[in-house]
Each structure stands twice: as C-alpha cells, then as structure tokens.
Amino acid sequence: MLAVLFYGTSLFAQDKPFDIEHAPAPLFRCPIYDGPTDPTLEWNTERQEWWMFYTQRRANVPNLQEVACVYGSKVGIAATKNNGKNWYYVGTANLPEPMQGQSTFWAPDVFKHKDTYYMIVTFIPGIHPFWGGDARLVFYLSLIHI
C-alpha cells in the first residue's frame, strides 16, 4: 500500500511570478545521495504543498562500478510550500519490495483516480554494475488520504 497520498493541480497557478531565469540550479539536491532523477509532482492537499517523488540515484556513493549508482535506489520524496522556490527532504516512500534483498526502484509516477491513489514504478531486483536486470513495472495503490 502506498503510504503517501496527494491531489494534483497545476504547479503554474502561482500567486507571484517565479523568476526562472534566476532560480537556483539544481532546484533540489537529495541530502542522502545527491542525485535525484525522474521527478513527478503531486499536490498534497492536507499539507498544502507540492510533493516531488523521484529516483533516489546514489550519485555520491564512492567506488561503485560503472552504472551501479543508478541501482539500489529507492523512491525519494521532497516537498515545497512555495511553488518550487525551496524544497526540503521528506524521506523515502515506504514501498513493499516484490523480492528480498537490496533492489532498485526507478522513475515513479503517481496519480489519482476517483478516491484511490496509485504509483507505478520500475522495479529491478539487485544492484548491477552494467545496464540490465529483470526490470518490471510494479503497481501500488492506497485508499488513505493525507
């Protein structure tokens, strides 16, 4: 069951203009592994903030072979209360893993249909130094509202 839920609206419906020309780059750095990728945004109605779900790529882990930094990743969560000007780290999605051992979650997408929230995400068992692995899409749902 997906432990985190939200409601989507437009990020561009802002009270004040956001000067993208002078925005910090990057807009968010994951404090755990540094390299967030594959973001998707959802509006959290209870907390009145945007939540970003992303691949928590292990960019700052030393001595990994080849592309191993993109394996072993969880779904990270960051949030903003001011339409993306400042982000803070929330944690990781508490997703049950389809298999035991350290696995990989890539490129989450979260959406709502009626009263149910869904996450679809790529799952790969294990950590690999080269591109490959037995990739599959896994599907999580939740009826909990936050």
Feature locations, PLM:
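Bacterial N-terminal signal peptides
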Residues: 1-8
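Carbohydrate-active catalytic/glycan-binding domains of CAZyme proteins
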Residues: 13-145
